[in-house]
Amino acid sequence: MVQFKLSTASLLALASYAAAHGYVSSIQADGQTYPGADPHNPNPESPGWQAENTDLGFVEPSAFSTPAIACHKNARAPPAHATVQAGSTIKLTWNTWPESHHGPVLDYIAPCNGDCSSASAGSLNFVKIAEKGLISGSNPGFWAADELIQNGNSWEVTIPANLAPGKYVLRHEIIALHSAGNPNGAQAYPQCINLEVTGGGSATPSGQPATSFYSPNDPGILFNLYQSFDSYPIPGPAVWSG
């Protein structure tokens, strides 16, 4: 009888495929709560982009050069917007997030240059407004995604105070690294939300398309969690200074 032995890392990675992945199910902005984009039950009142991710799956590194990396697979802009004042904080709550899916949490914003309901994911130019990666430890360490779980599967992001009024798309993303030690193993979970930003200043970001954010061999994408390490290079562009 042939016997196979798997490492702890391999077992964790395999187990993760059976875990339920999540999506942003609730958006709180300026005292209002909006429904997120449920992949199985679209809600016309949601400012979240509806994508073809009914498997609650991910965008893999081989697709990072396609529009799927912007707002998930074949994402479509909704007519609704969440209203938020520049400088205030938005709370994004996921319906669930697996404990095995350690990794960074990143937030971007892109101007729609008009109404966001007619925007396409591939045409948006984003700037990064927040990022958080490794917090402490290694093998696998404590990560931003773990902090999200500790906070009731929620994450807060502050809209830049100097952002010019207008309509924008907020891109919120977790990159799960539990399989990222293997080529094409990282898992990106981008979520997009239409915003109408009020108040603020006069800064309008120029940004870049999401297809230029990451490459499959970036050190923060091809990264082995299950080893000793002192730091983690957060992928993507630098945080926008305004």
Swiss-Prot record:
Residues 31-53 are annotated as: Disordered. Binds 1 copper ion per subunit. It comes from the Eukaryota. One of its GO terms (cellular component) is extracellular region. Pfam families: AA9. Cu(2+) binds at H21, H101, Y189. Keywords: Carbohydrate metabolism, Cellulose degradation, Copper, Disulfide bond, Metal-binding, Monooxygenase, Oxidoreductase, Polysaccharide degradation, Secreted, Signal. It catalyses: [(1->4)-beta-D-glucosyl]n+m + reduced acceptor + O2 = 4-dehydro-beta-D-glucosyl-[(1->4)-beta-D-glucosyl]n-1 + [(1->4)-beta-D-glucosyl]m + acceptor + H2O. Lignocellulose is the most abundant polymeric composite on Earth and is a recalcitrant but promising renewable substrate for industrial biotechnology applications. Together with cellobiose dehydrogenases (CDHs) an enzymatic system capable of oxidative cellulose cleavage is formed, which increases the efficiency of cellulases and put LPMOs at focus of biofuel research. GO terms for molecular function: metal ion binding; monooxygenase activity. Its main location: secreted. Its cofactor is Cu(2+). O2 binds at H178, Q187. It is found in: Secreted. Contains a small loop in a region where a large loop has been proposed to govern specificity towards oligosaccharides. The presence of the small loop leads to a considerably flatter and more open surface that is likely to enable the broad specificity of the enzyme. Belongs to the polysaccharide monooxygenase AA9 family. This is AA9 family lytic polysaccharide monooxygenase F. It comes from Malbranchea cinnamomea. The lineage of its organism: Eukaryota, Fungi, Dikarya, Ascomycota, Pezizomycotina. The gene is LPMO9F.
